[in-house]
Amino acid sequence: MLRLAARYADVINTGYPPDDHAQQRAALDAACADVGRDPATLPVTVPVWIAFPDLGRIPDHMKESTQPSAEAVADLFRAYDRAGVAHIMVDLQPNTPASLARLAEALNLYRSP
């Protein structure tokens, strides 16, 4: 699959946590080398589930994705940034104005120096 992505993809979506990303990126880089592609031309995206249990009910499948604070989410985003992830897609629960406000706070913290 990585070889197909290396040859044809404009972007590759993975599901690895930040700590596993370096190993997975190395495998992708090797696949790029095999097909003569510069690995820098194949950005990686990840889906990230973020759940704030203090703001409402969380679906069972997201129980392990809970975050205690906006700072914790900002730290998670920083870890993906350090790992070289180009784009994060967020699934936020509960889907409420309060959760969106906390996500906005996390993004502001992530972007601050």
Question: Language-model features: where?
Answer:
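Active-site-adjacent structural elements that line small-molecule/cofactor binding pockets in enzymes
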Residues: M1-P113
